[in-house]
């Protein structure tokens, strides 16, 4: 179309274009001669930039579409979890990772297209002009009246022979797949060699995938999908499937632990997805989403395999493949939550582990509880501690207390020493208001005075902010302790068997100082009722007594409670210590007795009469004479601290007869009427000083000679400053022989002496026999 035949509007447009072109050429010539000002040059550059903006945006869109298409292809090529995950015995919809999986799928569905595989760009063949589609043939062309040529096509007819041939080829191809290859014709030696060959191939494959992931995880993240498929046993011959699955699960675990970032991956919001992102940012987001997806799939697989171990008499045979895969999955979940408690789905792993503690197999329970215990010990911010305590409390309530004792014992490892004081309020708001007031009055103040006041206020504000950050940890600690006490009270309410009482009472004894004051009277009343139960073990009785005195030593001292009954109970329990034959139980009893008596007689020394303390000293040293060396050392060290806290006890080691009138009654289980001040402890200390254990002999001589701090009977300050139970633990650890057997030599000698009188030694008369035995040994 020429200029003459064009319409008026088209002519104006053409004139405008020609004029613009001439003006542009003229300006370019002037620019080359450097005769244009900077403003005009900048204006020309801006016009060029705006004209080419569409082209640049089109190029960016093409690149973004290509990246999105590649990502969609990788995601569509991922295979969903196998249908056998929906086993009837696994409530998969209520599993720990079900909600996480649904959220991830919902997120993916928002950005993925719903196109079928046949519409995938990569799977489509390119179409060029003049080429026919596959499966079509061209017919004779048809020429129309206006000269246009039409080239009709039709589908090719496939011959039956060709169809059968192609079908046979497909079947042969399927049979040639490695995981379907038939080795039944091989001999035993050939089968072993073939298995070794296949295993080596899969080992090389796993090593290659792992190496690529570790060298550049962001580029090779798709290899994590290949490792997951091997964990699932896909395309692996049955000859080596079990071994390859175990190897793949262990290798994938280590790879995940090495590439997991040191932060939790946050899901992007809809606004963030709609925003334009840099290429590096988009690649990082795609990598994080892929890592999170495969990490979740791996956790779901481990949960599925480990859940097969839970139930009545379920797969307790440790030689089966199901059990081996289950225990391997339990260890994998445990290692992930211990090594990366900050990462996504850590709370889901904790929920799964807590539920796995209901397994009937001791190995599973031990692995689960050890992982939970480690999480408690290493948790700094107490966030995962709070969630774990809540999960345990929920399980205890749901199961009505029918949980393993080991699970409750894990609560003892919580790293909590204080809780938040609800009455203490932060003064941050008041300080901020004061800061604005000072700035408002700046004009009426001198510069020096203004800076001084502002600096002091800023320092106070920083201190308050530091306290608030610390209060978040205390808040988590407070909530965690609430759930722990809820578990304890739920079990005490139902009065279960003694196996559950021991960890509950031990927990109450350890955390009694963190109890809220409104529970004090109820706890003391409950402990009083329980400790009077004759079937309660000595260790549990000591836990009850210690709980009461921890309460009474703190805020509970304002309660109107007479503790004398608990002193009598503790005095009576001491007679049972020599009769415990199990080393671990004896050690725990001695430690608990030492802690309880220190609270009763040292911390509360101002509220305890001297006659009562003397009775405990006399009975403790009498019992120590028939104990083996390490427990005896713990008791003697405790008695030494009593002599320091109560100096008037020195009358019990003096040679002169200046004690209280009357006689000592060792057969009475009441320390207030035993009249121990009328006796002495020189015989007991002399016998203990003759022991072969060097430290025990030194401690006994130190007490016997008035607890001197100088001279030949002084003690090593590094040992004498330790708590009695810590001293015993250190010496046990440093001993050449492990404390795996209770030495009953001294108790046997006592029983032989009693047998000569045709009597037997019992907790009720042991002090009477010890007095006669010591008198005969002089």
Curated annotation (Swiss-Prot):
Its main location: nucleus. Residues 433-473 form a coiled coil. It is found in: Nucleus, Nucleolus. GO terms for molecular function: chromatin binding. Keywords: Coiled coil, Nucleus. Pfam families: CBF (PF03914), NOC3p (PF07540). Residues 160-176 have a biased composition (Acidic residues). The keyword Nucleus applies. GO terms for cellular component: nucleolus. One of its GO terms (biological process) is DNA replication initiation. Residues 101-122, 151-186 are annotated as: Disordered. PANTHER family: NUCLEOLAR COMPLEX PROTEIN 3, NUCLEOLAR COMPLEX PROTEIN 3 HOMOLOG. Belongs to the CBF/MAK21 family. This is Nucleolar complex protein 3 homolog. It comes from Caenorhabditis elegans.
């Amino acid at each position: 179309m020429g200029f003459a035949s064009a319409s008026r509007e088209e002519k104006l447009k053409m004139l405008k274009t020609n004029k613009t072109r001439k003006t542009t050429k003229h300006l370019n010539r002037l620019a080359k001669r450097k005769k244009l000002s900077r403003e005009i040059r900048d204006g020309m550059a801006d016009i060029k930039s705006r004209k080419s903006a569409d082209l640049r945006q089109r190029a960016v869109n093409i690149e973004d579409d290509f990246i999105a298409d590649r990502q969609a292809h990788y995601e569509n090529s991922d295979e969903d979890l196998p249908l056998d995950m929906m086993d009837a015995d696994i409530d998969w919809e209520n599993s720990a990772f079900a909600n996480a999986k649904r959220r991830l799928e919902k997120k993916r569905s928002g950005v993925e297209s719903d196109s079928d595989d046949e519409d995938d760009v990569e799977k489509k063949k390119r179409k060029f002009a003049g080429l026919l589609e596959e499966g079509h043939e061209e017919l004779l062309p048809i020429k129309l009246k206006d000269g246009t040529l039409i080239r009709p096509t039709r589908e090719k007819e496939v011959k039956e022979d060709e169809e059968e041939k192609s079908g046979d080829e497909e079947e042969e191809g399927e049979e040639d797949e490695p995981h379907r290859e038939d080795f039944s014709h091989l001999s035993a030696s050939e089968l072993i060699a073939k298995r070794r060959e296949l295993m080596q191939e899969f080992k090389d494959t796993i090593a290659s995938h792992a190496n690529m992931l570790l060298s550049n995880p962001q580029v090779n993240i798709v290899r994590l999908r290949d490792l997951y498929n091997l964990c699932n046993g896909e395309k692996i011959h049955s000859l080596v499937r079990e071994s390859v699955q175990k190897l793949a699960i262990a290798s994938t675990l280590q790879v995940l632990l090495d590439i997991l970032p040191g932060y939790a991956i946050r899901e992007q919001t809809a606004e963030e997805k709609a925003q334009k992102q840099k290429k590096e940012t988009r690649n990082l987001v795609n990598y994080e989403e892929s890592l999170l997806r495969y990490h979740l799939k791996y956790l779901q697989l481990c949960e599925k395999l480990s859940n097969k171990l839970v139930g009545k008499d379920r797969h307790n045979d440790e030689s089966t493949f199901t059990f081996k895969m289950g225990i391997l999955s339990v260890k994998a979940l445990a290692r992930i939550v211990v090594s990366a408690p900050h990462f996504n789905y850590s709370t889901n792993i904790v929920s799964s582990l807590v539920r796995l503690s209901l397994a009937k197999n001791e190995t599973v329970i031990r692995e689960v509880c050890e992982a939970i215990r480690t999480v408690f010990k290493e948790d700094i911010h107490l966030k995962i501690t709070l969630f774990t305590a809540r999960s345990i409390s929920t399980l205890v309530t749901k199961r009505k207390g029918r949980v393993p004792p080991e699970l409750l014992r894990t609560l003892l490892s919580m790293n909590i020493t204080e809780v938040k004081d609800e009455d203490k309020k932060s003064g941050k708001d008041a300080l901020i208001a004061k800061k604005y007031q000072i700035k408002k009055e700046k004009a009426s103040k001198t510069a020096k005075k203004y800076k001084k006041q502002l600096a002091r206020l800023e320092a106070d504000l920083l201190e308050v902010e530091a306290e608030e950050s610390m209060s978040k940890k205390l808040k988590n600690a407070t909530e965690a302790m609430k759930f722990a006490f809820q578990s304890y009270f739920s079990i005490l309410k139902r009065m279960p068997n003694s196996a559950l009482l021991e960890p509950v009472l031990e927990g109450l004894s350890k955390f009694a100082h963190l109890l809220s004051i409104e529970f004090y009277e109820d706890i003391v009343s409950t402990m009083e009722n329980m400790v009077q139960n004759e079937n309660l073990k000595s260790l549990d009785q000591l836990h009850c007594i210690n709980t009461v005195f921890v309460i009474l030593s703190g805020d509970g001292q304002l309660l109107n409670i007479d503790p004398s009954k608990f002193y009598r109970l503790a005095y009576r329990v001491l007679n049972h210590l020599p009769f415990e034959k199990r080393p671990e139980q004896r050690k725990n009893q001695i430690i608990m007795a030492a802690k309880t008596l220190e609270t009763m007689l040292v911390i509360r020394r101002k509220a305890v009469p001297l006659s009562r303390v003397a009775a405990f000293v006399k009975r403790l040293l009498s019992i120590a004479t028939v104990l083996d060396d390490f427990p005896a050392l713990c008791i003697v060290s405790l008695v030494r601290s009593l002599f320091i806290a109560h100096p008037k006890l020195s009358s019990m080691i003096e040679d002169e007869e200046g004690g209280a009138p009357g006689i000592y009654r060792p057969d009475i289980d009441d320390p207030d009427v035993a009249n121990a001040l009328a006796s002495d402890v020189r015989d007991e200390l002399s016998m203990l000083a003759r022991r072969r254990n060097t430290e025990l002999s030194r401690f006994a001589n130190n007490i016997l000679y008035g607890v001197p701090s100088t001279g030949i009977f002084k003690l090593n300050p590094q040992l004498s400053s330790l708590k009695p139970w810590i001293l015993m633990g250190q010496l046990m650890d440093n001993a050449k022989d492990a404390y795996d057997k209770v030495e009953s030599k001294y108790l046997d000698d006592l029983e032989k002496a009693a047998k000569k009188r045709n009597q037997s030694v019992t907790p009720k008369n042991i002090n009477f026999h010890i007095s006669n035995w010591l008198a005969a040994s002089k």
